[in-house]
Amino acid sequence: MAVQKSKKSRSMRGMRRSHDALTTMALSVDPTSGETHLRHNVTADGFYRGRKVINK
C-alpha cells in the first residue's frame, strides 16, 4: 500500500481539489423555433443558427 512521505497541507489539498468542480451545460435558445439546445449543436427540429440544415 502506498504511504505518503509527509502530510499534505490544507493548502495543497485545496489546490488539488480546485479542478474538481462541475460545470453547467452551456445552453442556448434557437432564434427561430425558441427551443433550448446545447451550444454548437443542431436542435431536434433540424435548425442551426436560425437556418434549416436537416430536412426530415
From Swiss-Prot:
Cystine connections: none
GO cellular component: large ribosomal subunit
Entries under InterPro entries matching the protein: Ribosomal_bL32, Ribosomal_bL32_bact, Ribosomal_zn-bd
Gene Ontology molecular functions: structural constituent of ribosome
Listed Basic residues bias regions: 1-16
Keyword terms of this UniProt record: Ribonucleoprotein, Ribosomal protein
Keyword Nucleotide-binding: no
Signal sequence segment: none
Annotated GO biological process: translation
A Pfam family reported for this protein in Swiss-Prot or TrEMBL: Ribosomal_L32p
Renumbered residue ranges of the record's region Disordered: 1-22
Stated family: Belongs to the bacterial ribosomal protein bL32 family.
Identification of the protein by name: Large ribosomal subunit protein bL32
Protein species of origin: Aliivibrio salmonicida (strain LFI1238)
